[in-house]
Amino acid sequence: MADSLDHAPAQANNLPQFLALTIGAIGVVYGDIGTSPLYAFREALRPFGPGGVGRDEVIGLVSLVLWTLTAIVTIKYVLFLLRADNDGEGGTLSLLALLLKKGTKYPVLMFFAGVLGAALFIGDAMITPALSVLSAVEGLKLVAPALHDYVLPISVVIILLLFAVQSRGTGAVSVFFGPITLVWFLMMAAAGVAHIGDDLAILSAFNPLNAIGFLWNAGLIGFIVLGAIFLTVTGAEALYADLGHFGRHSIQAAWFAVVFPALALNYLGQGALVLSHPDAISNPFFLMFPNWALLPMVILATAATIIASQSVITGAFSLIRQAIHLGFLPRFEICYTSETQTGQIYLPLVNTILLTGVLALMLMFGSSEALAPAYGVSITGAMVIDTILAFEFVRRQWGWPALTAIAVLLPLFNLELVFLGANLLKVHHGGYVPILIAGTLITMMWTWRKGVSVLREKTARQDIPLSQFMAIVERKSEHAPVQVPGTAIFLTATPDTTPAVLLHNIKHNHVLHQHNVIMTIKTARVPYVPEKDRYTITKLSDRFSLLELRFGFMDDQNVSRALARCRKEGFKFEIMSTSFYLGRRKLIADPQSGLPQWQDKLFIAMADSAIDPTEYFHLPANRVVELGEQVII
């Protein structure tokens, strides 16, 4: 596996590389938003009912779609937020890490905002596969109405296969994601162009006054419809989250050259079709195609939704890894499915949780029409969070005056709040799902941070300063521990105090190695740490040294590889005569700990689910010694 420097944020050095990144971005970054035409316009028409939508309403709806895409995606994400990066990386937690690193007047507020945004994204990662795959497979009902009862079983099988292959990695097939999705966008554009001529009046949708007029005249229905209109921009947050994988210029080029034109043309075509054939309101996307093309389009749509689902699953894996490295969650097992790309990862526990959630949603709601109301809440919430974090970013990082930041971001913030309000109206129709998912994840992150803090406070009462300990053991006395040859490395989170495992080793084994290394692992609030800054070695005495290893929150925390680098640069030790000492704590709940009993139990359960540090840090298992202790928390 290559070093982290090989996985710095993507940059194109020549035209072929730029085109490759741009096509790749079309598949990964825009897969989600590219499947929205399957259901978004249909859902916007649904409140009017068959025959209840007039010409002005159709034109107004399409105008709303076009200007929502312009305001939210083009202006906020493509032109603005893509510039707000953390050493080339984007995403909610990446932006939060940068704000915490630079300093903010509201660290607690920013922390909870960032955690909420991340939690809402996980809700999106469950809803997107369920909704998009169902909406694609439902096209079979137009091909053969007799297949109606098979839509859900077929969708479930596709989801099962999708999650089953995650452990094998997607590197071999991911090269096809971009070309397949490019074909999908071209077909959508062609279908739109073919139907715009059905009623050229649809072109007046480019006039924003039609969108404003629709909202003014539609009243409550117009407000309700905004929740469905927002479905057209679901997936926009992926632009920001995938910034490090493809680079700003490639993502922008893909949007302006392919994605935005294709989406605009398709929505215009759907609108023109409904103007000329009002009965097409039932499924305007698939009814754009002649009967002979329906089956190929269902197959292509299914492929596109699988790619979109894969993108959010990969995004969820990446986000949880960031949360682990930033200390928001315990260390879950992380498997690397590529020898060359550290971004291709697989988290077995997260995969199982996502699969369970997706299947539960599909079986609970049964159709894309029933599930669609659940979708908008998580996306609008995540986008509002991005705007809040962006406001603090431009103030702290770019030095914008408060009035300038307000003038730029307040209109977008107000627009997103309106969309959020419209989506909250659908809470009882399924909008509660992402709220429950986000609430669960926030509770877990908060419990973990609070539990770790309480645990550190309890252990700190028994800590012995490292300098004091060294002075004691280096005194010559009959009670001094026996010196044995070799090197011992003691892993600790607090390098100024004596590791508990070192104290237990002397207490039970009465020995001290010839060379003792106190090793601490720090996660920097940057995505990647250069190899030249990976470690610092400080000699404390003839027998003790302090080794600090530093990793970014996107780095693979491979301690064995880092130690090999140290050895090349003069840190003298032999791996086969080195023992790694790790402490294993057995946590016992204490009603007087300061945590509620339910939170005590949740924290202990999360700690028990964490992967063994030996495996997580890639330590040589045959050189690891674990000593346990009970801690009442």
UniProtKB/Swiss-Prot annotation:
Localization per Swiss-Prot or TrEMBL: Cell inner membrane
Record's keyword annotation contains Transmembrane helix: yes
Transmembrane segments: 18-38, 61-81, 107-127, 143-163, 173-193, 211-231, 255-275, 287-307, 345-365, 371-391, 402-422, 427-447
Record membrane topology: Multi-pass membrane protein
Ribosomal protein listed as a keyword: no
Gene Ontology molecular function: any one: potassium ion transmembrane transporter activity
Catalytic activity: K(+)(in) + H(+)(in) = K(+)(out) + H(+)(out)
Function, as annotated: Transport of potassium into the cell. Likely operates as a K(+):H(+) symporter.
Protein name in the entry: Probable potassium transport system protein Kup 2
Native organism: Rhizobium meliloti (strain 1021)
Organism lineage string: Bacteria, Pseudomonadati, Pseudomonadota, Alphaproteobacteria, Hyphomicrobiales
